[in-house]
Amino acid sequence: MERTYAASPASVFNAWADPQLRRLWGTPSEDVEIRNDAADFRVGGEDIQSCLVGGEVVATVVGRYHDIVADRRIIYTEVISEAGVLLGVSLVSAEFLPSGTGTRLVLTLQTVAVEGSDLLEGVAAGWSGALDRLAQQLDAT
């Protein structure tokens, strides 16, 4: 997936790195709320997020950071589960490339679904919605 934003690579990277900002744009739609249960943005650090719909937890995502280069790249894994049952694992790579006065974001996802055949489509659709919401968040700042 690729998107171009009118903000600098540093601004787009910061929106990704700051857990409070990411909570605002990281949802696939306005129907989903993200709760940050833990946030440790560093190589080896772990984020734990609960995805809520109507106040009920529908999924838990545990992320572990493997590579962070400020304003350039983030590589991490996400373990996705529901009620303690593993649904899948994603490898996520986000590259922040200068593009004129803005940023071209290149997001590469590799997801393995363990349970639930709709997980792959859900992950892709969720990221697409989140990246659209990131544009709105960047425009608001």
Question: Which residues fall in each region the model found?
Answer:
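Aromatic-glycine hotspot motif
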Residues: 1-10, 66, 97-104
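Hydrophobic beta-strand positions in extracellular immunoglobulin-like domains
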Residues: 5, 109-111
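Hydrophobic pocket/interface hotspot
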Residues: 12, 22, 47, 65, ...
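Hydrophobic-ligand binding "helix-grip"
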Residues: 23-24, 28, 37-42, 48-100, ...
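Short helix-to-loop capping/linker segments positioned immediately adjacent to catalytic or ligand/cofactor-binding
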Residues: 1, 82, 117-119
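A conserved amphipathic terminal alpha-helix motif
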Residues: 111-141
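Residues at helix-coil transition
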Residues: 17-18, 70, 132, 139
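Hydrophobic ligand-binding cavity/cleft-lining segments
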Residues: 1-32
